[in-house]
Amino acid sequence: MIQSRQLEAFRAVMLTGGMTSAANLVRITQPAISRLIRDLEEEIGISLFERTGNRLRPTREAGILFKEVSRHFNGIQHIDKVAAELKKSHMGSLRVACYTAPALSFMSGVIQTFIADRPDVSVYLDTVPSQTVLELVSLQHYDLGISILAGDYPGLTTEPVPSFRAVCLLPPGHRLEDKETVHATDLEGESLICLSPVSLLRMQTDAALDSCGVHCNRRIESSLALNLCDLVSRGMGVGIVDPFTADYYSANPVIQRSFDPVVPYHFAIVLPTDSPPPRLVSEFRAALLDALKALPYETI
């Protein structure tokens, strides 16, 4: 079997044109370089050099072999470079799974900032339901995920992040638009556009209203918070949504107000548990946490 040391010696002779200079290049003795060339010729059964006195002349076969050997060494050099860049976290790829609300706009900003000084880093962002985030990350199809449903889940490490307050959305001209904070009791008898009954935020909203003895007209439900915002903007009612979606929709005709009592909006970062996250993933996680802490949303 051809040895890498033999190929290194052959390459050195081809580059320098002689045994002595090749020996100096690879820092071994001239007899050692001669032996490596001889062993290589015996291994492949081909004469690589014509010897005339102290001079060497590469054969045609040596020229062909040299092209392949050069590709081999160029590949190794490229791998060395890639490894060095990976160590510096300037190369690599990230696969991130995220549920809808943060993916609308917030995650785009995080990714934009993160790759600004990492030109060789690629990011794939997949927007899927929270339960799917947990499944995909636990199976290691993704490096990191953001999910609402982040309790004890097999194969996952869960890291809670700052909890925000849900907000109240009002249509333009609503009787409550002059209030800085809308209280649950203010919504007595109002048309309340609701999220799906299986939504955690819907359950928490219902609990807050029930605790205050408030009865609303729940004629319209939507499984998507963006649809809820659109319905509010059309004057169909008021709504309680997460701050990410409210912020994303803020350019449209809706009025955003604080809501009391507090309706908490919890979510978490999830990572596979099988092994420590690569450096690139750890740095993205840190950037994500910094961005969350910098948000102007009301925290709990």
Swiss-Prot record:
Offer one Pfam family short name for this entry.
HTH_1
| Signal peptide start-end | none
Which biological process, per GO, is one annotated for this protein? positive regulation of gene expression
Q: Which UniProt keywords apply?
A: Activator, DNA-binding, Plasmid, Transcription, Transcription regulation
Q: Which residues bind DNA?
A: 19-38
Question: Known InterPro entries for this protein?
Answer: LysR_subst-bd (IPR005119), NocR_PBP2 (IPR037424), Tscrpt_reg_HTH_LysR (IPR000847), WH-like_DNA-bd_sf (IPR036388), WH_DNA-bd_sf (IPR036390)
Any one Gene Ontology molecular-function term assigned to this protein's record:
DNA-binding transcription factor activity
Q: Domain HTH lysR-type, which positions?
A: 1-59
Keyword Transmembrane belongs to the record? no
Does Transcription regulation count among this protein's keywords?
Answer: yes
Residue ranges spanning the membrane: these are none
Q: What does this protein do?
A: Positive regulatory protein for the noc operon involved in nopaline catabolism and uptake.
Family membership, please give it.
Answer: Belongs to the LysR transcriptional regulatory family.
Question: Which protein, by its recorded name, is this?
Answer: Regulatory protein NocR
Species in which this protein is naturally found: Agrobacterium fabrum (strain C58 / ATCC 33970)
